[in-house]
Protein backbone atom coordinates (compact mmCIF):
# COMPACT_ATOMS: atom_id res chain seq x y z
CA UNK A 1 0.00 0.00 0.00
CA UNK A 2 1.17 3.53 -0.78
CA UNK A 3 2.47 5.60 2.15
CA UNK A 4 0.23 8.50 3.19
CA UNK A 5 1.15 12.09 2.38
CA UNK A 6 2.62 13.66 5.52
CA UNK A 7 1.70 17.20 6.57
CA UNK A 8 3.60 18.97 9.34
CA UNK A 9 1.32 21.13 11.49
CA UNK A 10 3.29 23.86 13.31
CA UNK A 11 1.71 24.97 16.59
CA UNK A 12 2.79 26.42 19.91
CA UNK A 13 1.43 23.44 21.85
CA UNK A 14 -0.93 20.51 21.51
CA UNK A 15 -3.14 22.00 24.22
CA UNK A 16 -6.83 22.86 24.17
CA UNK A 17 -6.49 26.11 22.22
CA UNK A 18 -8.66 27.10 19.28
CA UNK A 19 -6.17 26.36 16.48
CA UNK A 20 -5.16 23.08 18.10
CA UNK A 21 -8.79 21.99 18.47
CA UNK A 22 -9.60 22.83 14.83
CA UNK A 23 -6.55 20.92 13.57
CA UNK A 24 -7.57 17.94 15.69
CA UNK A 25 -11.13 18.10 14.29
CA UNK A 26 -9.62 17.80 10.81
CA UNK A 27 -7.18 15.10 11.87
CA UNK A 28 -9.92 12.91 13.33
CA UNK A 29 -11.96 13.13 10.14
CA UNK A 30 -9.43 12.87 7.30
CA UNK A 31 -8.61 9.61 5.56
CA UNK A 32 -5.41 8.86 7.49
CA UNK A 33 -4.47 6.12 5.02
CA UNK A 34 -4.01 8.91 2.47
CA UNK A 35 -2.93 11.88 4.63
CA UNK A 36 -1.15 11.87 8.00
CA UNK A 37 -0.48 14.82 10.27
CA UNK A 38 2.65 15.29 12.35
CA UNK A 39 3.08 18.16 14.78
CA UNK A 40 5.97 20.53 15.50
CA UNK A 41 5.38 22.26 18.81
CA UNK A 42 7.32 24.90 20.70
CA UNK A 43 7.21 23.47 24.20
CA UNK A 44 8.75 20.57 26.09
CA UNK A 45 5.53 20.06 28.06
CA UNK A 46 3.12 17.28 27.21
CA UNK A 47 -0.07 18.61 25.63
CA UNK A 48 -3.71 17.66 25.98
CA UNK A 49 -3.86 16.02 22.52
CA UNK A 50 -0.48 14.20 22.60
CA UNK A 51 -1.83 10.72 23.32
CA UNK A 52 -4.60 11.05 20.74
CA UNK A 53 -2.16 12.31 18.08
CA UNK A 54 0.09 9.31 18.63
CA UNK A 55 -2.89 6.90 18.65
CA UNK A 56 -3.96 8.32 15.28
CA UNK A 57 -0.48 7.69 13.85
CA UNK A 58 1.01 11.16 14.17
CA UNK A 59 4.40 12.16 15.52
CA UNK A 60 5.11 15.10 17.81
CA UNK A 61 8.39 16.97 17.45
CA UNK A 62 9.52 19.56 19.97
CA UNK A 63 11.42 22.57 18.70
CA UNK A 64 12.76 25.48 20.74
CA UNK A 65 10.45 28.33 21.58
CA UNK A 66 11.33 31.48 19.66
CA UNK A 67 12.69 34.39 21.65
CA UNK A 68 14.05 37.50 19.95
CA UNK A 69 17.56 36.69 21.19
CA UNK A 70 17.57 33.14 19.74
CA UNK A 71 16.70 34.01 16.13
CA UNK A 72 19.76 32.28 14.68
CA UNK A 73 19.55 29.12 16.85
CA UNK A 74 15.78 28.94 16.18
CA UNK A 75 16.34 29.09 12.42
CA UNK A 76 19.17 26.56 12.72
CA UNK A 77 16.92 24.17 14.66
CA UNK A 78 14.32 24.35 11.89
CA UNK A 79 16.94 23.91 9.19
CA UNK A 80 18.33 20.83 10.93
CA UNK A 81 14.87 19.38 11.60
CA UNK A 82 13.74 19.79 7.99
CA UNK A 83 16.99 18.33 6.69
CA UNK A 84 16.37 15.21 8.82
CA UNK A 85 12.66 15.05 7.92
CA UNK A 86 12.34 15.28 4.17
CA UNK A 87 9.13 13.23 4.17
CA UNK A 88 6.78 16.21 4.30
CA UNK A 89 4.69 17.27 1.32
CA UNK A 90 3.42 20.32 3.22
CA UNK A 91 4.29 22.47 6.21
CA UNK A 92 1.17 24.18 7.57
CA UNK A 93 2.12 26.98 9.94
CA UNK A 94 -0.38 28.19 12.51
CA UNK A 95 2.14 30.48 14.23
CA UNK A 96 2.35 33.48 11.95
CA UNK A 97 4.60 35.34 14.35
CA UNK A 98 7.47 32.98 13.47
CA UNK A 99 6.26 31.65 10.11
CA UNK A 100 8.59 34.10 8.36
CA UNK A 101 11.45 32.00 9.77
CA UNK A 102 10.27 28.38 9.52
CA UNK A 103 8.32 28.53 6.23
CA UNK A 104 11.27 29.86 4.18
CA UNK A 105 13.35 27.09 5.77
CA UNK A 106 10.73 24.59 4.57
CA UNK A 107 10.99 26.03 1.05
CA UNK A 108 14.78 25.82 1.30
CA UNK A 109 14.39 22.13 2.22
CA UNK A 110 12.33 21.60 -0.95
CA UNK A 111 9.00 21.05 0.82
CA UNK A 112 6.44 21.17 -2.01
CA UNK A 113 3.82 23.33 -0.26
CA UNK A 114 3.98 25.84 2.58
CA UNK A 115 0.95 27.49 4.14
CA UNK A 116 0.59 30.21 6.77
CA UNK A 117 -2.74 30.17 8.58
CA UNK A 118 -3.44 33.30 10.59
CA UNK A 119 -6.16 33.19 13.21
CA UNK A 120 -4.89 36.07 15.32
CA UNK A 121 -6.88 39.27 15.40
CA UNK A 122 -3.98 41.43 16.50
CA UNK A 123 -0.73 41.75 18.36
CA UNK A 124 0.43 42.73 21.81
CA UNK A 125 1.82 46.16 22.52
CA UNK A 126 5.43 46.95 23.26
CA UNK A 127 8.55 45.42 21.77
CA UNK A 128 7.02 41.96 21.36
CA UNK A 129 4.09 43.40 19.40
CA UNK A 130 6.37 45.45 17.16
CA UNK A 131 8.52 42.37 16.50
CA UNK A 132 5.46 40.26 15.67
CA UNK A 133 4.18 42.88 13.21
CA UNK A 134 7.60 43.12 11.58
CA UNK A 135 7.90 39.33 11.26
CA UNK A 136 4.42 39.03 9.73
CA UNK A 137 5.12 41.76 7.19
CA UNK A 138 5.30 40.34 3.67
CA UNK A 139 4.63 36.82 4.94
CA UNK A 140 2.60 36.22 1.80
CA UNK A 141 5.86 36.51 -0.18
CA UNK A 142 7.54 33.81 1.92
CA UNK A 143 4.94 31.06 1.60
CA UNK A 144 2.84 29.42 -1.09
CA UNK A 145 -0.51 30.05 0.60
CA UNK A 146 -1.59 32.59 3.22
CA UNK A 147 -4.95 31.86 4.82
Predicted features along the sequence, with ranges:
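Membrane-interface segments of envelope glycosyltransferases acting on lipid-linked substrates or membrane lipids
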Residues: 1-147
